[in-house]
C-alpha cells in the first residue's frame, strides 16, 4: 500500500511542475537550464517516472519555476481545495 502512495506523490509532483511550467509559458528545457538539471531528468520527474531529491526539487521549484514550496504544495492537487482564479 505504501508503494502506491509513493507513486501517487511522484505523479502529483510531476503534474504540479508541469502545471506551473505551462502557466508560465516555459519549456522543459528552460526550466531545466534555470534549475541546473538535465532536461531528460526534468522530463522524467514531470512525468512521474523519477524521484527527485529535496535539493533537486528546490532547484526546480525555486530556481526553474520561480516559485516556492508553500505555493507549490498549496495547490488543489495536494490538498483537495480549489484554487481561486
Which residues are covered by each model-predicted region?
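Recognition helix of helix-turn-helix/homeodomain-like DNA-binding domains
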Residues: 36-51
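Conserved hydrophobic/aromatic packing and binding residues within compact polymer-binding modules
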Residues: 17, 31-32, 42-45, 72
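A short, Lys/Arg-rich alpha-helix, primarily the initiator
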Residues: 1-23
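DNA major-groove recognition helix of helix-turn-helix/homeodomain DNA-binding modules
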Residues: 55-71
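Short basic helix-loop element that most often maps to the first helix and adjoining turn
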Residues: 15-34, 59
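The DNA-recognition helices of helix-turn-helix-type DNA-binding domains
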Residues: 49, 64, 76-80
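Short, charged recognition helix plus adjacent turn
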Residues: 1-6, 70-85
